[in-house]
């Protein structure tokens, strides 16, 4: 049996770092000491960028990267291959032992993009190229639409204002009809299209801006987690 789990809330924001854990079983090989034996775990993410393996254990042993196993990442798909072939040993020494891989990934998903604002993580284990188990985990990001109108007395007569500018904050305070927010809570976005922005991975991301501009009076901001803005 194999499973993959994410820790924490599954309703996340773009740029958030998540921790995942893959649990599987070290396989037994029919020809125990064959030099052709291979054991790999392949993790294929959508809306995620896998960054690092923080730990890998087999049974009670903590393995060392590049000594006991290797990790390679496909630059085109982002898929990560963990190759444990070095650790197979002789006479099926580790067969049946529990394998636990803990690693981190950054959320890149946003509503309206190819991933649809949903991150997915699929892990499969392979013995000599044959799949021995697989599992997947998923979560999502949210979005809000902001609207700016003129101040006509009758609401039905109000017109949406093209070019209206907004700054978006989280963790603000409201008292006596006034809203205050800390500069540190200001959010930064990257423009995708007119009136459409996604949360920046950081304020230093290329073309990141704290000002979002409405088209025909509305602007959509994506990649948000749960909260009040």
Regions found by a protein language model. Name each.
Residues 1-229:
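Solvent-exposed loop/turn and edge beta-strand elements of beta-rich ligand-binding domains
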